C-alpha cells in the first residue's frame, strides 16, 4: 500500500507537471555594443630642420673597461625639438654624472643645449649654465655641432666640435673634438661607438 500510494502520488505530480504551461524561455542577453578605441592623436608636424637628425633616434650603449658602460637615448624629433640623455655607469653600479640635451629648431638655426649634473643630481658648480652649441652641418646620417659664437653664452670650455654619425644601421658614433691649446698640438678626439639597444 505504501508503494502504491507513493506511485499514485508520483503519477499525480507528473501529470500536473505535464499539464502545466512551459515556462517562458529566458531571453538571451544582447551583446554589448562594440567599443572602438579613440583614434590616436596626430603627431605634431616635425620641423624640417630637424629631419636630418632623426638618425640619432633610439637607445645606444657601449661597454667599457672594468664593467663600466655608457648609455645615450634620443627621442625622435617632434615639433621643433628632440631630447637626449646620457649616463656613465661604473662597474660597481655608481653613476658619476648625467647629461641632458635639448636640440631645438629656431627661426634661423638649430641649437643644442646641454646640462651636466653629478650623480646625486646636483649641478656642477663649473657648469651651472647650459652649454650652447649650434648645428654647423647635417646630412647623410651625420651632424656636427660647434660652440655658439659668443664664448660667454657657449659655456663650451675647450670644446671645438661634436659630431654624431651612423656607422651602419646599428652603430651611433659620437666624436668630441677639443680645441688645440695655444702653442700645443691638438689633443686626440674622444670617440664613443655605441651599439643600438634592441
Label for each model-derived stretch:
Residues 4-16:
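Bacterial N-terminal signal peptides
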Residues 17-46:
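Compositionally biased, proline/threonine/alanine/serine-rich low-complexity intrinsically disordered stretches
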Residues 45-59:
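N-terminal helix-cap/turn-to-beta initiation motif at the start of protein domains
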Residues 47, 62-151, 155, 160:
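Central antiparallel beta-sheet cores of small beta-barrel/beta-sandwich binding domains
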Residues 126-138, 171-198:
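Edge beta-strand at a domain terminus
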Residues 147-149, 166, 176-178:
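Short, structured patches in soluble enzyme cores that scaffold and shape functional sites
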Residues 157-170:
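Extended Gly/Ser/Thr-rich low-complexity repeat segments
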Amino acid at each position: 500500500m505504501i508503494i502504491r500510494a507513493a506511485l499514485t502520488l508520483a503519477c499525480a505530480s507528473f501529470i500536473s507537471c505535464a499539464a502545466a504551461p512551459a515556462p517562458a524561455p529566458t531571453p538571451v542577453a544582447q551583446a554589448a555594443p562594440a567599443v572602438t578605441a579613440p583614434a590616436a592623436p596626430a603627431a605634431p608636424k616635425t620641423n624640417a630642420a630637424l629631419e636630418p637628425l632623426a638618425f640619432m633616434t633610439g637607445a645606444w650603449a657601449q661597454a667599457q673597461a672594468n664593467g663600466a658602460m655608457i648609455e645615450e637615448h634620443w627621442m625622435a624629433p617632434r615639433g621643433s625639438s628632440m631630447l637626449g640623455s646620457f649616463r656613465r655607469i661604473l662597474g660597481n653600479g655608481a653613476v658619476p654624472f648625467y647629461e641632458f640635451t635639448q636640440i631645438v629648431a629656431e627661426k634661423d638655426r638649430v641649437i643644442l643645449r646641454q646640462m651636466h649634473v653629478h650623480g646625486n643630481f646636483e649641478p656642477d658648480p663649473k657648469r651651472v649654465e647650459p652649454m650652447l652649441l649650434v648645428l654647423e652641418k647635417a646630412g647623410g646620417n651625420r651632424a656636427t655641432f660647434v660652440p655658439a659664437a659668443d664664448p660667454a653664452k657657449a659655456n663650451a670650455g675647450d670644446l671645438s666640435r661634436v659630431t654624431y654619425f651612423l656607422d651602419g644601421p646599428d652603430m651611433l658614433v659620437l666624436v668630441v673634438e677639443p680645441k688645440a691649446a695655444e702653442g700645443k698640438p691638438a689633443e686626440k678626439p674622444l670617440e664613443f661607438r655605441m651599439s643600438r639597444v634592441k
